[in-house]
Regions:
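Bacterial N-terminal signal peptides that target proteins for export
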Residues: 1-11
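Bacterial N-terminal signal peptides
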Residues: 10-21
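Non-catalytic cap/lid and distal C-terminal segments of serine-dependent acyl enzymes
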Residues: 19-328
């Protein structure tokens, strides 16, 4: 084998190892258990079920997990608030169960800290839940396909006051983006260790994270990345662009991050806190001890879920049974 061929193989091997290592570094860490699923058409109340719907926006089936409240079958005239939960990078709709979030919510409910609501977690690939410049339209898949389908198919109250969105890591970007672009649709937005990116990565950056982010962002914002498109789909800028509508909606904002976040996301989260303060936008922000990922989220989940539940309660409609709509 000649010298040039050996060099080419060596460089290719390093590149493959680099991307694999960074992908593993960015994936939220926690041991995964095999999810338990049911073959029934409707979810078992209190348990997690997996389903899908045809999505025009992404040109294929949009998979999702759904959890119905324990009283769903027993109290057949009652409608419920709904939470849309967005997973992080390298995840899918099953993360919500196998990473322990569903169990954490059930525990909070059993302890009387929160009440009953429906939870839906769609599969978002590594899309950042936006309409990619040259790819799939995940913002439209959620806003135009998923939410109408869920609220037609299940007994959801279906008012902005009883609809919430939440995300972890990359899903935090997505939750904030969708909430700020469509503030009239949600009562609350809550995030844990949101993957906020205040600027495009330096194309000359040689560190592993910069190179991986450049590769990822190129698939979403164009190659080379389109700066204007990046700002138009970045919650750190969208909040300013749509500030009047956000304030008018009265949407409640909560976010937190670990002080020892291994991706350094505590810094852009702190900057985001400062920006919202300067914009005069009410919000709640916390830095808690902890790293990045699912284990961190579970350790502080009571803060965000009590926050969204208290805002659901402010509407009052879920505290008593709501009569079924005609034709249900």
């Amino acid at each position: 084998m000649d010298l040039l061929m050996q060099l080419a193989i060596g460089i290719l091997s390093v590149m493959i190892t680099l991307v694999a290592n960074v992908a593993a570094h960015l994936m939220p860490r926690q041991a995964a258990a095999t999810p338990q699923t049911s073959s029934s058409a409707q979810p078992t109340p209190g348990g997690v079920q997996y389903s899908s719907l045809p999505s025009e926006a992404i040109g294929k089936e949009l998979k999702f997990a759904i959890v119905l409240p324990p009283s769903y079958e027993r109290d057949t005239k009652r409608r419920y608030p709904v939470l849309y939960f967005l997973h992080g990078m390298n995840g899918n709709e099953r993360e919500f169960e196998r990473r322990g979030v569903a169990a954490a919510i059930s525990k909070l409910r059993d302890e009387g800290k929160i009440g009953e609501f429906i939870i839906v977690s769609p599969a978002g690939e590594n899309s950042f839940y936006l309409n990619a410049k040259n790819g799939l339209r995940y913002e439209d898949a959620i806003i135009k396909d998923l939410i109408p389908y869920i609220e037609k198919t299940y007994r959801v109250i279906g008012t902005p006051a009883t609809r919430s969105i939440q995300g972890i890591s990359m899903g935090g970007w997505g939750a904030l983006l969708l909430a700020f672009k469509h503030p009239e649709m949600f009562s609350t937005v809550t995030t844990h260790c949101a993957a906020l990116v205040p600027a495009l990565p330096n194309p000359q950056g040689t560190d592993r994270r910069s190179q991986f982010m450049l590769q990822l962002i190129g698939r979403i914002f164009g190659d080379p990345p389109d700066e204007a498109y990046f700002r138009a789909a970045n919650p750190m800028f969208v909040v300013e662009q749509n500030l009047a509508a956000i304030k008018k909606s009265g949407i409640k904002i909560y976010f937190d991050c670990g002080e020892q976040d291994r991706l350094g996301l505590q810094e852009p989260n702190k900057a985001f806190d400062e920006k919202l303060t300067k914009l005069g936008l009410a919000h709640e922000f916390h830095l808690f001890p902890g790293n990045h990922g699912w284990e961190y989220m579970i350790s502080v989940a009571d803060h965000s879920y009590m926050f969204l539940w208290n805002n659901f309660k402010a509407d009052g409609k879920h505290t008593t049974p709501v009569r079924s709509r005609a034709g249900d």
